[in-house]
């Protein structure tokens, strides 16, 4: 029996196709397999992902762009590969995930390309500050916020 598609499936497929030319091709992003997604992020659930490399703040960096199952209604995530040792950089989780937004942050599902571009820019800015040691005080602020 053929798989039925919901409106959300169609929106996901449409949003991914919109990312192809302006972002994924430009970054020369390599698709991640479902096995890679489950292996690298066993405590999280992503529907699709891509890996790309670049120089950020003078450091060769590999990032994963990760789309949740309910993208474009939920923002994408970015993961640093390989994950740094814990507490190396502020706003980087143990599995390398970058903390760019608070949980439940609203995104515009009609603008998936703009959402990804903005979060990619935020990821680059965070890593530039981290590599330069400019945001080490954020550890203290994060600790105090809990």
Q: Regions from the language model: what does each represent?
A:
Residues 1-52, 63:
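Long, charged/polar, low-complexity intrinsically disordered N-terminal extensions
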Residues 2-19, 77, 83-144:
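Glycine-centered motif in EGF-like
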Residues 32, 36-103, 113-114:
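Compact alpha/beta protein-protein interaction domains typified by the UBC
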């Amino acid at each position: 029996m053929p798989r039925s598609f919901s409106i959300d499936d169609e929106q996901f497929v449409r949003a991914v196709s919109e990312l192809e030319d302006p972002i994924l091709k430009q970054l020369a992003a390599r698709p991640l397999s479902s096995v890679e997604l489950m292996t690298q992020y066993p405590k999280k659930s992503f529907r699709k992902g891509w890996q790309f490399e670049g120089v950020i703040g003078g450091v060769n960096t590999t990032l994963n762009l990760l789309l949740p199952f309910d993208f474009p209604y939920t923002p994408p995530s970015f993961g640093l590969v390989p994950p740094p040792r814990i507490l190396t950089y502020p706003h980087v989780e143990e599995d390398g995930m970058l903390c760019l937004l608070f949980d439940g942050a609203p995104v515009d599902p009609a603008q998936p390309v703009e959402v990804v571009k903005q979060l990619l820019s935020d990821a680059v800015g965070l890593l530039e500050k981290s590599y330069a040691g400019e945001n080490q005080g954020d550890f203290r602020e994060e600790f105090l916020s809990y």
